[in-house]
Amino acid sequence: PGVKLPDFSQFGEVKREAMSRMMFATANNMQRSWLNVPHVTQFEDADITDMEDFRKAQKAAGEKKGVKMTPLPFLLKACATALAELPQFNVSLDMERKEVVRKKYIHIGIAVDTPNGLMVPVIKDVDKKGLWELAAESAELAQKARDKQLKPAEMQGACFTITSLGGIGGTAFTPIVNTPEVAILGVSKAAMKPVWDGKEFQPRLMLPLSLSYDHRAVNGADAARFTTVLSQLLGDIRSLLL
């Protein structure tokens, strides 16, 4: 049931304005997902010290290519590998037919913060693309989202979503699953932390990851495996490049 609002004008001056179509659609989708999906969030920190060193070393190559290498392509590749290794995350539930729809493709949505609200363009076949191709495509789609130039087909077909607040701040959050997907990865701001290496504490750049998932489709042990795979991949840049 909806929540009946009081007359706020009795408390002070107010102004009413119509919701944009995007805001109304997003609100409906969020409410539908939250009401229908039993959410659980698994948290993990990934050591991205070496990854960041490698990424920053690509600055000159990026200038030649006209592409900026951000952390997002690494996250995309890591998620694509994890989805391939743990295919129970690459499904949708058809509750009416009592069936699990298993997808043989890996398309990943990237949440983009725009002046007009949140938009989620989709990168197709992430598992078949290299880091530079993913960097170029994600930048192009994000710009199209900000310019309100995305086509409907460019926002459809995702198996999984990545939403990042790392450029703003925060240490963890619970992203809402974008149903009919069954999982979404939230990325917070990386920070230097002391990490014990067996002999002494070392300063390491740690990236907080928050994996929300549909507990009907995914159990807790598999969620822990998924974030562990992500942490291992992001912590060893060689594994992502193979």
Language-model features: locations:
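C-terminal catalytic/motor cores of large multi-domain enzyme assemblies
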Residues: 1-242
